[in-house]
Amino acid sequence: MNSYPKFAEIKGIKYEINTDFRVALECNEIANNSEIKDEERSLAIIYLLFGEQGLNDYENWNSLLRIAIKFLSCGKEIEDEYDNEEKEENMDYQQDWGYIRTSFFSEYAIDLDKEKMHWWRFYELSCGLSEKCILSRVRFIRDFDISQIKDSAEREKWIKQKEMVALKQTKNEKSSEEKRLDELFEKQLRRWVNWAKQMDI
């Protein structure tokens, strides 16, 4: 059985982590909201994951941010370099929530509206969804390259399908959304760390 982290420790101080997958998804939204200042985003994520204890412990903000990134990236270490190749996104947790919820119920008999679940388990299960589920089918349609279709009627059919499931364009939308969550948060961390250095944290 997998052992998922529930606490973090810095200099002998123990912090309880809010491990609920809904909180992690909220952190993802905040990290991708360019209308919020970097320092406000970082503090919001510290508060969501570590509560008042983390928010009040300003001397350890930098360390808490690094732990937050590692937690949100499901334990993967932060690397100095990453693949910054931009890809067209094919999923958005907020816009696709209905597809995600339906897919979890059909594949795992899990009702996400009622289930309490650790973020890491949610992420692992979402990665394990089969090609048959509605979310996977929608993502396939979004990714499908219609340029390979020669028949005009068939091409028109695919164009309509793509329009039906297309993600809505938003101000805060990032072209790298499709990348693994750890890559997204690694990028964000670099801004937070630079801000923390300026604040001499």
Task: Spell out what each predicted region is.
Residues 1-14, 21-24, 32-36, 43-201:
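Charged interaction scaffolds used for protein-protein
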